[in-house]
Regions:
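N-terminal transmembrane-helix/juxtamembrane module of multi-pass inner/ER membrane proteins
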Residues: 1-44, 77-105
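Membrane-interface elements of multi-pass transporters and channels
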Residues: 21, 56, 78, 82-91, ...
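Membrane-helix interface segments
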Residues: 25-26, 56-61, 90, 127-132, ...
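Alpha-helical transmembrane segments
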Residues: 36-42, 66, 130-136
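Hydrophobic/aromatic residues in alpha-helical transmembrane segments
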Residues: 45, 75-76, 119, 136
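Alpha-helical membrane-inserting segments
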Residues: 49, 71, 75-80, 84, ...
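Interfacial segments of alpha-helical transmembrane regions
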Residues: 50-75
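Membrane-embedded catalytic cores of phosphoryl/pyrophosphoryl-handling enzymes
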Residues: 93-183
């Protein structure tokens, strides 16, 4: 069996298991968190609170978080989704009615997860407490994307990798550019 086929089958199996094992009450909480994060509302609100209440460090963290989020959204939704035309998980894998409310865009990668991880990872080095608080909804969003049938687990993992890369780039590119400029 090929590696690609094994990955596809594992993705399908994990999608079905995740969607069927989340209790109904938890599914509603996951959906509510995802709704708050839709169009990056949750992360923009978090940035406003950090900038308003966190002093200079809060403003730096908010700027880093929003910049990383924008980079992640561009990479995930503007580039990767356009290149990878992967269909959403089939409805028969999802044993609940939330499967009807899914985007029409490519499944790969998860833009919600990319944005959540990017914001969280960019904020955490400057304001660790805010990073820890943001990690909770970020993790819930990642689980929700699979549980709702919007994504396969590999889409979510790819989104998380894009988010981490965007945060790293946001935090390190300015220093690298300054060093190059100075030399």
């Amino acid at each position: 069996m090929s590696v690609t086929r094994t990955l596809r089958e594992t993705d399908r199996r994990l999608t079905g298991r995740t969607a069927s094992r989340v209790p109904a009450g938890c599914g509603k909480v996951l959906s509510a968190v995802e709704e708050c994060a839709e169009s990056s509302k949750l992360w923009c609100c978090a940035a406003v609170v950090m900038a308003a209440c966190g002093g200079r460090r809060g403003r730096l963290a908010a700027a880093a978080g929003l910049t990383a989020l924008a980079v992640a959204q561009l990479a995930a939704n503007g580039v990767c989704k356009q290149l990878a035309d992967r269909p959403r998980p089939p409805k028969e894998l999802i044993p609940h009615d939330e499967v009807e409310d899914r985007p029409d865009s490519s499944s790969f990668p998860s833009g919600h997860t990319a944005a959540a991880v990017a914001f969280t990872a960019a904020v955490a080095p400057t304001v660790p407490a805010a990073g820890a608080l943001c990690a909770v909804p970020a993790a819930l969003i990642a689980v929700e994307r699979v549980q709702s049938g919007a994504h396969y687990p590999s889409d979510v993992v790819a989104g998380a990798v894009i988010g981490l890369g965007s945060a790293w780039l946001t935090r390190n590119a300015p220093r690298s550019a300054a060093r190059l400029w100075a030399s």
